[in-house]
């Protein structure tokens, strides 16, 4: 991903400790998603070349899919009751992101701030509602988050090596 310098005025979505789900690995991934969304916002704001925006959009979609896969793995391993509903939320967002990517690449439709606002709102609400629900349920069950995080790191690296994605370096 290209490095874009961000001034404080350009931060579209700022991480807050209120977004923490008390699972370090998941919090780190949420922060990275927010960072990628901020880069997309800056690229769109500065009217950067479509090619540069496409790279950031591809990173957002790819990282989101990887994050969702790990999050779903956690919920499955913990036998989380709300797993299917949570997975459906993920599926709907991925479908929307894939549609956006196709429109942008094939139909040359621009990315509008309305869409960026939608993504920001979706992520914020999803973290504060759905993700906090599963986190709380897992902790009440006594599920070993520490053991999962160790296994998740290895799984994440394996996924990255298969796809050759840039985000391997953040782990």
Please report, for each region that a protein language model flagged, where it lies by residue.
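Small-residue-biased structural context
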Residues: 2-171
């Amino acid at each position: 991903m290209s490095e874009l310098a961000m001034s404080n005025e350009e931060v579209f979505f700022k991480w807050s400790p209120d977004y923490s789900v008390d699972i370090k690995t998941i919090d780190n991934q949420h922060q990275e998603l927010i960072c990628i969304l901020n880069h997309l916002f800056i690229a769109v704001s500065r009217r950067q070349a479509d090619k540069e925006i496409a790279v950031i959009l591809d990173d957002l979609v790819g990282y989101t899919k990887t994050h969702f896969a790990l999050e779903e793995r956690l919920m499955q391993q913990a036998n989380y009751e709300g797993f299917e509903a949570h997975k459906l939320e993920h599926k709907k967002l991925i479908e929307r992101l894939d549609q956006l990517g196709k429109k942008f690449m094939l139909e040359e439709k621009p990315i509008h701030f309305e869409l960026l606002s939608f993504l920001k709102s979706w992520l914020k609400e999803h973290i504060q509602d759905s993700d906090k629900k599963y986190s709380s349920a897992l902790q009440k069950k006594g599920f070993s988050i520490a053991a999962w995080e160790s296994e998740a790191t290895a799984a994440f690296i394996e996924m990255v090596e298969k796809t050759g994605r840039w985000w391997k370096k953040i782990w």
